[in-house]
Structure formats: structure tokens, C-alpha cells
Amino acid sequence: MQTLKEGFEHAPKFPFFFPRLIEFYTSENRLDLAMDVVDEALKVDAESGLYLYTKSTILLNQGKNKESLEVSLKLLERNDSVAEVNYNAGLAYFNRAVELDKNTQLSRKRHQEIMGYYQKALPYLEKYRNMEPKAQEKWALPLYTIYLNLNKGKEFDEIDKIMKRPLTP
């Protein structure tokens, strides 16, 4: 571990150290330390797609959906064809809707806000599904929930059938 830290400090752009440090910290559920590595990397290259994507993912895993969404949307402005960035953006909107929906005493305004987040999540998650059709374990449940809440009967029926089938490796 110390070797990875030292290597990253001395050669932050060398592609060996950054992903291994991030992987180690995330596997140990030390997202705070993983974010420290990302922040250091962004000081060296603030426009790196890899570093920004990693930041978006860590923020998402920390439950910081608004911040994750901001980073994801910045990346999507530059290139909207990266599947995982679409997934992060869609999931950030989805998570915000789910969080608001936990309150059973919803006002009309709050309900509209929730539906708005589901609506915003939809294109990103559908795009991710089209780009990564075999990643059903990532897109199926969020799309199922969105289709259900937005009363998209045809799409809901399709995803319901997909979810009832066993996953293929």
C-alpha cells in the first residue's frame, strides 16, 4: 500500500497507481481516502475524464447524489457516449427521487419534484441500458421503478418480463 501511495505522489499521471489506490480504498470502504486520491489527481489534471468519472462514482457511493450529478453532467457535456457516466447521472437523479419518496406525507409540490427526478433519470438509464444491455443487474430495477412511477405501461410490462427471467452470464 505504501508503495502505491509513494508511486502516485511521485508520478500521479502514471496509469498504474491511481486505479489501484482507488480500488484498494473502495474495497476497504474508505471512500474518504479514495476521494482524497481523486482530489490530488484532479490537482494534476482537472479535466481528466477518468478522474472526474471516478469522483462522480465515489460521490454516488457516498450518497452525495447532487454533487455526483454535477460532475456527471459536466462529463456528459463533453462526451455523452460513455455508458458508465450516463449510468451515474441516471442513478443520481433516481436516488434523489427515491430519497424524497421515502416521506409518505407528500405534498403535491414534493410529488411533482419526485416525478421530475424520475423523468430526468429516464433518458440516462435508458441510454445506459442500450449501451450495456448485459448489465441488467444495474439498470433493471431503477428502470422498473421509474416506469412504474411514471405510468409507462408498455415499458413497465417489458421490464417486468425481463426481471422475471433468470440472468444469463
Where are these regions (language model features)?
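Short coil/linker segments at helix-helix boundaries
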Residues: 95-124
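Structural register within alpha-helical repeat arrays
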Residues: 20-24, 55, 89, 96, ...
